[in-house]
Amino acid sequence: MLKKIILSFFIGFVVVVLALGVVFFNLKSNSVYYAQHTPHKAEMEPVLMEVTRNLDWIYSPDIKGIKYDYDGYRNIYNKKYGKDEAASFAYYFREEWSYDDGNFFLYKFDKRFRLISVWNVKTLEFTSKPVDVSAVKRDIYRVVQPVIDAQSEPLINLQWIYDWVNKDRFN
């Protein structure tokens, strides 16, 4: 009798752990799809945030001109944009993002995706000129759009769980 109870609890525990693992994997690997459909503040960019934050989980297609860097920071390089070098978009583990436009400017964003600073690589100083943030965000989308377009719809849609987990992050 005692063996049956212990075995039942053990099997139940294993089933719960496996179910949580499947949900976690689904949320991570389909985070870009879920971010496209999640409610968020106007200035937030959940798609841009998730495409690099979960770069090692999402589908990274082999597209000519696009390179991925998983060592250290998570970067997406697009050689089609930028005059001197490839434009890149990166995620730092302290919840910051950076965009290198390939034209001597490095834009830094905080965890709410607000512009923190603009670094001029040519003069090695921060620029104080006003920046059109919406134009910078359009440029970032242009750089990572092929990766975003390659993401498929999840087999099991857990949008409601994704929205519940990230409600404070994007609002």
Predicted regions and their residues:
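N-terminal export/targeting and maturation segments
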Residues: L18-D101
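N-terminal first transmembrane alpha-helix
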Residues: L7-S8, S29-H37, N166-R169
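N-terminal Sec-pathway targeting helices
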Residues: M1-L18
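Alpha-helical interaction segments
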Residues: K3, F24, V47-L48, A150-P154
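Extracytoplasmic electrostatic interaction patches
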Residues: Y70-N171
